[in-house]
């Protein structure tokens, strides 16, 4: 009996020891392993694929905090505008770790195949933020330019990085050919919501003063992130979001979960995709000049689904686009991604009478 009790005590002792020692040991192993992978992504993004795994999130976070050049914060890339705060300059050389590009603009927006040719007829307008503008690709590689090379109508690309829907509409409305444009493709991003909500709440955007513009021009890319930066950031995410962190480590769920979901506001309160869709439609309704135009809306799948599933005006048509190929660190579509987006947009437009009319392809 005494030997049996002694054996039970030994087993219980080892169980307690493992219960006490194993969790911090496993956490330390996870911290080190994730940090090593994230640092390798940061140093050698070409070795890795873009994903929502925790190591990709960490690498991208630190890339934008320390290393990335921001197009609209570079004085050679933007100029002051008294209505939009900033607009593209005539062009600049824009370089980051994963690309080196030349962006050229005219009064017709980012240069496309048709903006350099004698295309005639009602133009097809593209409005959006950095994805439409073509952050990370050259002029002839944007999806708007690729579409321009495959259709017989003029294609004008008015995308500008970090514009919300409000400024996107203001920009195209000021163009001389806006009255004759019958079709507009508008690309939506989750970060458009703040600008749209502010406009709807206050009735206008903050005054675009020269002082605010000067505040945008910053010195980015001050230093390279080092391994200690990676470890500290990894530890912070593991401490603040243990469930999401380990779910991503073991491949059970992409990171983020709720706490880091793009559908959460800066205050941390949940936001349904229907709020984005409703704000987007309300902004469009505020511009009566759009009433006689066909508006094709593309963006994240949940946003497009909310748009398609709700009540919307008869001139608004959702477009589903699968964003598959992105830069590993930079989180913008790469050259292949733009080719795929162009193909999908054309396929979507060709499926409807309204879309075919915009492409001048008959009934």
Residue ranges and their predicted role:
Residues 127-128, 187, 298:
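Short hydrophobic segments within beta-strands
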Residues 329-363:
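Histidine-centered active-site loop/cap adjacent to the catalytic His
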């Amino acid at each position: 009996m005494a030997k049996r009790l002694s054996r039970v005590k030994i087993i219980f002792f080892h169980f307690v020891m493992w219960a006490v020692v194993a969790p911090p040991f496993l956490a330390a192993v996870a911290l080190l392993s994730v940090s090593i992978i994230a640092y390798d992504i940061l140093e050698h993004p070409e070795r890795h694929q873009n994903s929502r795994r925790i190591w990709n999130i960490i690498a991208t976070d630190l890339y934008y905090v320390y290393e990335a050049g921001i197009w609209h914060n570079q004085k050679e890339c933007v100029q002051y505008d008294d209505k939009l705060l900033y607009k593209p300059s005539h062009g600049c050389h824009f370089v980051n770790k994963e690309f080196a590009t030349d962006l050229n603009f005219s009064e017709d927006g980012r240069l496309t195949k048709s903006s350099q040719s004698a295309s005639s007829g009602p133009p097809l307008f593209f409005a959006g933020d950095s994805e439409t503008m073509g952050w990370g690709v050259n002029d002839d590689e944007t999806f708007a330019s690729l579409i321009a090379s495959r259709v017989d109508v003029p294609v004008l690309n008015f995308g500008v990085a970090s514009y919300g829907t409000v400024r996107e509409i203001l920009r195209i409305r000021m163009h001389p050919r806006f009255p004759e444009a019958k079709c507009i493709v508008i690309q939506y991003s989750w970060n458009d919501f703040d600008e749209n909500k502010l406009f709807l709440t206050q009735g206008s955007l903050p005054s675009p003063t020269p002082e605010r513009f000067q505040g945008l021009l910053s010195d980015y890319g001050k230093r390279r992130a080092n391994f200690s930066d990676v470890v500290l950031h990894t530890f912070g995410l593991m401490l603040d979001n243990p469930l999401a962190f380990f779910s991503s480590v073991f491949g059970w769920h992409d990171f983020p979960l709720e706490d880091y979901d793009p559908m959460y506001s800066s205050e941390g309160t949940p936001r349904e995709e229907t709020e984005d869709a409703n704000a987007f439609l309300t902004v469009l309704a505020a511009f009566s000049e759009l009433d006689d135009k066909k508006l094709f809306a593309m963006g994240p799948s949940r946003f497009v689904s909310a748009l398609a599933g709700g009540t919307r005006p008869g001139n608004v048509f959702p477009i589903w686009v699968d964003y598959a190929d992105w830069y590993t660190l930079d989180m913008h579509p790469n050259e292949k991604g733009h080719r795929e987006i162009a193909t999908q947009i054309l396929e979507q437009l060709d499926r409807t009478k309204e879309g075919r009319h915009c492409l001048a392809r008959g009934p």
